[in-house]
Amino acid sequence: MKEDGMAKITTDELIESFKEMTLIELSEFVSKFEEVFKVTAAAPVAAAAAPVEPAAEAAPEKTTFDVILEAAGDKKIQVIKEVRTITGLGLGEAKALVDGVPSKVLEGANKDAADAAKAQLEAAGAQVSVK
């Protein structure tokens, strides 16, 4: 990193910046970080022992997910607020998305972003599925 008179950012300052970002912004950050540093954010998995006989070809693991709002529940206003937070949509667009269930809140998101969005929406009282 260049030291062109710029102050070094502390870990705490980075964390505070992340707290202010939406899930989509964080997902984009992780993707860019992985690209720039040629790393992956996936948790390491312990290697399993090789099977004695060749196993049937496993289905490829899904890497992108859609978050589907199935029902808004009793707390529709809270669900609209969460949809706005997750997607960055305006009030009218978020309301239309919630009113038009089932509807996609996120499309092509990574597993972590999809799970986080699902948890946020469920905490607001919505019924959500990830496909």
From Swiss-Prot:
Family: Belongs to the bacterial ribosomal protein bL12 family.
Taxonomic placement: Bacteria, Bacillati, Actinomycetota, Actinomycetes, Micrococcales
Species for this entry: Tropheryma whipplei (strain Twist)
Keyword Ribonucleoprotein: yes
PANTHER family named in the record: 39S RIBOSOMAL PROTEIN L12, LARGE RIBOSOMAL SUBUNIT PROTEIN BL12M
Its biological purpose: Forms part of the ribosomal stalk which helps the ribosome interact with GTP-bound translation factors. Is thus essential for accurate translation.
Keyword Secreted set for record: no
InterPro entries: Ribosomal_bL12, Ribosomal_bL12_C, Ribosomal_bL12_C/ClpS-like, Ribosomal_bL12_oligo, Ribosomal_bL12_oligo_N_sf
GO cellular component, one term: cytosolic large ribosomal subunit
Keyword entries, A-Z: Ribonucleoprotein, Ribosomal protein
Cited CDD domains: Ribosomal_L7_L12 (cd00387)
Pfam families: Ribosomal_L12, Ribosomal_L12_N
GO biological-process terms attached to the record: translation
Descriptive protein name: Large ribosomal subunit protein bL12
Subunit comment: Homodimer. Part of the ribosomal stalk of the 50S ribosomal subunit. Forms a multimeric L10(L12)X complex, where L10 forms an elongated spine to which 2 to 4 L12 dimers bind in a sequential fashion. Binds GTP-bound translation factors.
